[in-house]
Structures are given as C-alpha cells and as structure tokens.
Amino acid sequence: MPRSRINGNFLDKTFSIVANILLRIIPTTSGEKEAFTYYRDRMSAQSEGNYAEALQNYYEAMRLEIDPYDRSYILYNIGLIHTSNGEHMKALEYYFRALERNPFLPQAFNNMAVICHYRGEQAIQQGDSEIAGAWFDQAAEYWKQALALTPGNYIEAHNWLKITGRFD
C-alpha cells in the first residue's frame, strides 16, 4: 500500500483525497499520475522525518516528471533534505539545479544564502576572516536575489544586509 494511503495525519489525508479527485478529473498521462504519487509519498515521508525514503521518492519523481517547473520544486525539496542532513554542498547543488529550471524561487536563494552565512560563521570560528568574508559576500548576493523576487520578505536578511553594509 502506498505510504500516502496509510498516513494518519488529517491534513495529509485531506490533501491525498483532493489530489486523487483532481487526478481523476484533470486530463493527465499515466506518467504524470505516477510522478505525482511519488511526490505525494515523499511529502508524507519527509513530514515524518524519514529523509532516506523521501529522497528515494523524490528521485523516482524526477525520473518520471518532465515539466521543468515541477522538476524545479522536486529539486528544491531534495535540497531541503540535504540541508536538514547537514550536507550543505549537496544542498547548494540541488538549489542551483532548481533555479536553472525556475529562476523565480526566492526560497532557494534564501536557503543558499543561509548556507553561505553559516559557512561564513564557521570560518570566523576557525579564525579565517578572509574566507568568512567571501562566504558572507556570497550570502549577500543570494539574499539580494531573494529580496528582488519578494520585496518585503526575508526581513532579517534585509536587516543583516543593511547592518553589514552589503545592501546597495
């Protein structure tokens, strides 16, 4: 039985019911339906903290999904899992790949900035201010891109840019 059918969460059940109805009434190919099933199962696994299973479902959804916009969100979510697992360089790779398919993902730019800022903080702790500065500069560039797409969001990032003199 697919994971999405056995999840006890009310919202997940509601989403699954609505999604199943939509899949019946909207013309879709069998491949699109199968890709969506993997995507839905991934959401269920990820919400339960089962990242390994979520990744497997994402990779299967990527194999089946052909729409670049939908693929961008799958790639973004793979990046989220790698971020949660502390695999920052892998996460950055997936955020980049998501943005190649959909350059209007401010959350991907924000997450990339957060990773770069974190790496800058690590460099400071290791006493390497030059490397820290490079990471912080890169974080600033990503936050500027996120803010350009969604003015008014990411207030903390906006304030950090102003305080550090990186806001043009």
Curated annotation (Swiss-Prot):
From which domain of life does this come? Answer: Eukaryota
Q: Which GO terms describe its biological process?
A: photosynthesis
The ranges of the TPR repeats are 35-68, 72-105, 120-153
The record's keywords, sorted A to Z, are: Membrane, Photosynthesis, Plastid, Repeat, TPR repeat
Asked whether the UniProt record includes Oxidoreductase among its keywords, one would answer no
> Which Pfam families does this UniProt record tie to the protein?
TPR_1
Which GO cellular component terms, listed alphabetically, does the Swiss-Prot or TrEMBL entry include? plastid membrane; thylakoid membrane
Which named protein is this?
Answer: Photosystem I assembly protein Ycf3
Source organism of this protein record: Cuscuta reflexa (Southern Asian dodder)
* Lineage of origin: Eukaryota, Viridiplantae, Streptophyta, Embryophyta, Tracheophyta
